Amino acid sequence: MIAFGAPRRRSFGLLFSLAPHLFFLFLIGTLANKLNVPQVLLPFSREPGRVPFLLEAQRGCYIWHSTHHDAVTIQPLYENGTSCSQRAVLVAESTQPIRLSSIILAREVVTDHELRCDVKVDVIDNIEIVSRTRELYVDDAPLELMVRALDSKGNTFSTLAGMVFEWSIAQDNESSREELSSKIRILKYSEAEYSPPDYIIEMEKQERQGDVILVSGMRTGAAVVKVRIYEPFYKKVAAALIRLLVLENIFLIPSHDTYLLVGAYIKYRVAKMVQGRMTEVNFPLEHYTLELQDHRLTNGGLPSKSVALLDEKTAMVTAVQLGQTNLVFVHKNVHMRSVSGLPNSTIYVVEPGFLGFSIHPGGRWSLEVGQVYVITVEVFDKSSTRVYISDNLKITFQFSKEYFEEQLSTSNGSYHVVKALKDGVVVINATLTSSLQERNSSQPKTYQISHQQEVKIYFPIQLKPSFLAFPHHPLGISNRFTVQVEGGSGNFTWSSSNETVAMVTTKGVVTAGQVRGNSTILARDVQNPSRSGDIKVYVMKLNKMELLPFQADVEIGQIIEVPIAMYHVNTETKEAIAFTDCSHLPLDLNSDKQGVFTLFKEGIQKPGAMHCSSVHIAATSPGHTLVTVSVTGHEEHAWSSATFAAYEPLKALNPVDVALVTWQSVKEMVFEGGPHPWILEPSRFFLELSMEKAEAIRVAEVRLPAKRKQNQYVYRVLCLELGEQVLTFRIGNHPGVLNPSPSVEKVQVRFICAHPASMLVTPMYKAPSGTQPCPLPQYNKQLIPVSSLRDSVLELAVFDQHGRKFDNFSSLMLEWKSSNETLAHFEDSKSVEMVARDDGSGQTRLHGHQILKVHQMKGTVLIGVNFAGYSGKKSPKGISNSPRSAGVELILVEDVTVQPENATIYNHPDVKEIFNLVEGSGYFLINSSEQDIVTITYREAESSVQLVPAHPGFLTLEVYDLCLAYLGPAVAQIRVSDIQELELDLIDKVEIGKTVLVVVRVLGSSKHPFRNKYFRNMEVRLQLASAIVTLRLMEDQDEYSENYMLRAVTVGQTTLVAIATDRMGKKFTSAPRHIEVFPPFRLIPEKMTLIATNMMQIMSEGGPQPQSIIHFSISNQTVAVVNRRGQVTGKSVGTAVLHGTIQTVNEDTGKVIVFSQDEVQIEVVQLQAVRILAAATRLVTATEMPVYVMGVTSTQTPFSFSNASPLLTFHWSMSKRDVLDLVPRHSEVFLQLPAENNFAMVVHTKAAGRTTIKVTVRSENSSSGQLEGNLLELSDEIQILVFEKLQLFYANCQPEQILMPMNSQLKLHTNREGAAFVSSRVLKCFPNSSVIEEDGGGLLRSGSIAGTAVLEVTSIEPFGVNQTTITGVQVAPVTYLRLSSYPKLYTAQGRTLSAFPLGMSLTFIVEFYNNIGEKFHTHNTRLYMALNRDDLLLIGPGNRNYTYMAQAVNKGVTVVGLWDQRHPGMADYIPVAVEHAIEPDTKLIFVGDVICFSTQLVNQHGEPGVWMISTNNIVQTDTATGVGVARNPGTATIFHNIPGVVKTFREVVVNASSRLTLSYDLKTYLTNTPNATAFKLFISTGRNVNLKGSCTPSQALAIEKVLLPETLMLCHVQFSNTLLDIPASKVFHIHSEFSVEKGVYVCLIKVRQESKELRQVLSVADTSVYGWATLVSERGKNGMQRILIPFIPGFYMNQSEFVLGHKDTGELRILGVERVLESLEVFHSSPFLAVSGYKHSMLTTGLTVYLVRIVNFTAFQQMSSPAFINVSCALTNQQEAVIVRAKDASGADHCEDSGVFKNFVGSYQILLFTLFAVLASTSFIFLAHNAFLNKVQTIPVVYVPTTGTTQPGSYTATCSPPHFLSSRPPLVQSRLQHWLWSIKH
């Protein structure tokens, strides 16, 4: 909860720190929720009904609380019976008449937000009456008066609800004394139609008055209403008074302000409201008078005159002069004259300004011919205010008699009724010509004001057609029809009376057809909406359609419009109504023959004058068909059909126009097309051929064979006489009933018979269609080429004297000859083959063909043809003029070819490509497959084709030989292309100083390259971004590219692009090729020495950056092997060469390109000996020096043997431990490295003395070949001398000396800089003072000379004191260096680290020492660092000089070597081991595993760090303790962070649980015995246990309280016996837990409280229990494993008491399964009882009976304590007891009878079961079924009755019937029977 006084900043901080899902609730609570009032003031009262107040919140549910219950109580109000309260009632409970206060707090139950209300209780000091008005009207609505109470400070009380007041009418001192109740009356709310508050209704029922009342006016006058508080306590509070005036509700007509002209008058009327109706009042008035007051004159008026005069008798006001005055009501009663509510009116006397017109109806000046209109002329003053027009005003109104007829007009001319006569535009005029006689004036006042108005008159609006009828379509297809409008202005608004039936657009387009019905479409004139026209629209059902008469046959290509009429037929009157438009209905056009007619233009349908739709069908093929037109998708199938025929156009095929034949030759004339015989009347078909001269020709009709066309008509015409005539062919059908207007067609041709005049022989050219013929015959050349490879056909044509070619000359005799038979000859020179051919004129003629045989030889031959005469017996006249011979000279040539056949041409106007044509006739047709791509110029003289490109594209150049036999054109494939792409091909990584080839290609479309001869047109050039490389054009060039030589000059990167410009000036740039010039690629080290099994990684420098993958190979893999990372492992002694290449694969060629390569010499040796490398053997005390193991040679460094497999171990020892300490590396950070990593140590000198250091190197296996001679160990030792450092003074004041290496510098600083003037100088007194230089400012520089100098530093203080200090500076060479690590690592007590934690950040610091171990203060050494592998550490220079930063990224040992580049012998080697610092191992983690993470890392104070997890939904982790639960499969990373020291991590891979493993203690089993111990079912989700790692108590607590891993597991049980109709969940309660002790999940199965019936059923149930579990996150994913749990039900007894007599025997019946019954123990507690052995029931399975009797009845009766029979079972741990009591003596006789009855009952029982057996034998089917069920279901049918005594469970031997006679069957039996007979219901 937020405190009320909290600062705003804190509130906002809390607001934004809320969880997102609470933010909305917080906003509601703080910004939206509030109480209806913040403060409440309640009146003090001693009456029983205290004053309540309703406090209400806006939203939410609240708990209300009052801080001062004695003063204020609060009662919540609940909504609709719920526990949610938004309102509460405040009641003042104060009993003291003093001011008390309380705070009401309302707390919201969800957000806990509190609302506050301050409540005060005080005494009423005074009261007053509040009213919205002080004036009432007679018979008007009543007025509400309210009491407002104030305290002594003037504060208003919040409510007075419930307080009793006395209202009364008091005497008005100002008015005359009358009866008090005559003016006003106090009303109850029940008497008025008002809705008062509920408390007022209750008070009025009790005849009390509250703080609110109603008063009503009775008659005019004044009245006083008084109120006081009824409660006696407030009798001293003064009453409140209010004075009310009651007025009459009168009106002045007109009530608005009036404007008059001078001399005009107006007569007023007065009306009043009586009982809701307005009634006019006659003058004079009873209570009022009218007066003109406040006369205000305008400038220039006469003050002696009034503005207007009033006639009081008639209420007429006459305007006198300009100005204004008020007409007011004055009350005759003097006391009422102060009333302000009486009506009044202001009268303005003005001058006229202008006139205006108004017209009715419509109010628009757009009129209609024949209509009557009212035109009103209005007068306005200069302020545009309308002036009242009196009768004495004169207005002249003028209009055209041609356009208007005046029907009525007023005397003053302001009102006219006219009728419009004709259409047109006319102007009306009005003029104010008033002559008003002013009073006391002799001159009349005249006005001349005019106005005119333009009027447009139109004809009445008429819509065409008179009505519209549309068919209704059930699919909602709408009809659209444009209504035509006549009359009106032409601009209309359209509307529909029923838009569901018909809608209309703004253009008058009616849409209807979706809904049946009718509607009226109305068109209103926009200029005058009162003018309109309408049309009725009907949407009706379509019943009938028909096709109207039309022409039935038509020529192909022509169109027939088929008109369609559709109707709605009234079912009663049979009247047919034709639809106006049905063109939008979808029509289905079906033909019995497809393809004869088709729908034209996708079915154009349009209505006409006699039809509502039409179908246009086009004749497409000859034939006839029955066309059926129907409406698709309609409710009733409407259709109509008709037959149509189509025929081809009639034409003369041969001849087309003229036929020319020789004498006695025949012309076959062919006509085609024309009408077919009409299918319905074929007998009326006719055809005829008529001629002019029948004797000159003989005509015979040729009957065509079946294979010829049916519509062709052939006639053979034989020439009998020379001459010319016209033949006419007609075809068609005669008119008939079924075809009244059939089509008839005719065509005419000319027939000529003549002598031949000339002949022509030409080779026959089979030119392709569409090409021109051979031009040789036109040129009349002497030599005509023909093919020397193929036989040629020579054609003979014959012409008459007019040059016309003959159609047939077969009657002539001819002879053929060849001049050179070796070149060509004729096989039959006498005959000629007549071939019919169309020679291009469209007419077929017969030509003479002769085959010329060739012998594939070139040459020239002359061919001749001789004419011998006619083949007839006699010849006609004039034959002597005929030709005798014709000849032609031929040249034999080969076919033409095009060179080149393929080419890609650059699209540039300067490009001209030449294609040569070789051989052929020389007469060619050049064709292109595409136009406008190139400009083709055929150069006939050169026999070539020139192509100039115009547009890009692909084309085929076809060359046709026009004068050779056609086999096909010679072709060339040509591609014209713009520049599409520039391609640069080069190796983009070049080693400095090397050269590579650069190939430039320009590609066109489809990646085809251009020839380089076009490059000059393209302006191809190369451009470099920088000059780190050079380019040189090569002399040797490829045809399709330009080649350059690129030479690398400087290391760096640049970009090379190729640039070209096309014909439009657009630049094309190739993809930039980034060229990297890299330094020479080098592998490090140049030579590598390894022992067998040792691994070291090859490093590299130089080469392309970022470096590509280096491909390693080794020359001898028996010596060493290398992997892809460059890690070399020694195999056996020997040498090998390792090659490393940087290469890539060219994407275009697929070739491997090698950028650079280098090699390393590999030597694998055996360690012959080891030696300890110590840089110095004489050291001062208190210094450190690294020592490490080396081989015999300097190349056998720790890199050579520190990473062998198996590892070598290094054991160090000393002869004297008090002289120095020998510690492993990284001991400064508390790391304890194992012996395998101790190849390097650190010597810490302690005291002066001499000691020996020894190292022993051991190999675990002599067969590994690591040591020479298969030795197992090698050793070495050295001596170290430690001496005391020279000291001049005692140790507490030892002066310091500056130690500098040679060629270094050091900047000195003092503590007085800035405060004093500090200077320094090198003293010259020392002989070697030249070893350093000093600039005077504290900068020391050492040279290349070793020695010692003295430095003097002087400080001149501002206060007059000089300080001087002298120190020594020694310059010496660096002897050795040492690597130390940082930061320090701390572990828990008793724990050590053997490696750096994974993920840790390390800092390595390099320190330098001289030959005796003194540390240098400055450095100038150039260091080189090397690693034996780079995959475990990320290492690099630190942020300070001579420091290195490293990150441990992988497990393993890395050997770090550091040495001086100028002095490689000065080196140090350290092992850096990295291991996991977080336990346990997380390799095999499954969903559900609980992991207790731990680490031995702590901070310097021994405190652990903080745990973090990368993904909490995979491994839910408690960050405080470091325990996690694997909830989902995936990968997560666990972090342990010790701030400022170390941050380590471990990756956790969570696998999906393959299967849940279930188990339980085999010694346990399930039972349903009450209070039985819980059964435990153990579940494991992984392979073993689910608990990983060892858990601390805090982690175990977090598992139990925070992580709750058991929520992952769901446990289930089920009885194995499926026939047992009891769910296991009714018997057992099951839930899951996680056991930290066992590390597995546990399902706890406990027994629920069971009913007796359930225990009874289960007691004999032979069943087990299936148990299984599922993971919540992986439900249904894996196979479910179930385990069978043994179940032993508890036995059941229905008896708790025996009442036995002297000779009675009780039967103790126990139900249970067999093994339970066998383990029962039954014993009695009294010696007077006897329990006989049990016996099994033969009829009922699972029932055992024990007999109980009393041995000594008398002694048993005298027992003071009750006797028991105890029944127990060891299997189920169940114990039951039955009380045995003795029967009293009073029931002896009855008991004897009962004993007899008992015997009878026993016999009856036997009879009952005997009867049951008999019935069973008669009902074999039932018993068989029942036996089958009993066999399957092991639950027995047991009748265990309940006793009939008053004590349930007791057994009375004499007074109870036997148990097996109980009338109520048990639950299982009834359930079994119901199940048995209700199998399928």
From Swiss-Prot:
**Residues carrying covalently attached carbohydrate according to the record:** 80, 344, 808, 1441
- Record localization: Nucleus membrane; Nucleus, Nucleoplasm
Which UniProt keywords are given for this protein, alphabetically ordered? Glycoprotein, Membrane, Nucleus, Signal, Transmembrane, Transmembrane helix
**Protein name according to UniProt:** Nuclear pore membrane glycoprotein 210-like
Q: Tell me the membrane topology, using the record's own terms.
A: Single-pass membrane protein
Task: Please state what is observed when this gene is inactivated.
Answer: Knockout animals do not show any overt phenotype. Males and females are fertile, with no age-dependent decrease in fertility. In males, spermatozoa have a uniform moderately abnormal head morphology, frequent flagellar anomalies and decreased progressive motility. They do not show compromised histone removal or nuclear compaction failure.
**Signal peptide boundaries:** 1-32
Name the gene: Nup210l
Any single GO CC term annotated in Swiss-Prot or TrEMBL for this entry: membrane
